[in-house]
Amino acid sequence: MSKILVIDIETKPILSYHWGLFNQNISLEQIKEDGGILCVGAKWLGGKNCHFFSEWEHGQEGMLTATHALLSEADAVVGYNSTSFDIPRLRGRMVEHSLPPLPNLTEIDLLKTVRKLGLTSGKLAYVGPFLKIGRRY
């Protein structure tokens, strides 16, 4: 049986100094603190336990190391916009912390499926109620 991991990350913003609010081009020299991954939530499909790793509880390296271990066990990874956002962000931060490259992952990005439906919006706040899934249903 395949091991399928459902995953989501939350990120923090880039902090910068700049001189206005309209039409700003922020240079690298203006960045005070680079944004990064704040936390990772993951659950094995069919499993009962959720895994939660955070910068404040595990530190950046601990969070990434634990996430790397889960992803390395997975036959496939499921997420929402994960192919364009979550997985590349994780790969980049893992390189930053000298973790070994992740194995090739079979990625199932649910946003790609939702886009085929031609809905008004692909945002989860719209898709959940439209499909009658989520906390309220």
Residue ranges and their predicted role:
Residues 134-137:
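A conserved mid-domain beta-alpha-beta active-site/ligand-binding segment of alpha/beta enzyme cores
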Residues 1-72:
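Conserved RNase H-like, two-metal-ion catalytic cores of nucleic-acid enzymes
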Residues 46-130:
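Conserved DEDDh/DEDDy metal-dependent 3′-5′ exonuclease domain
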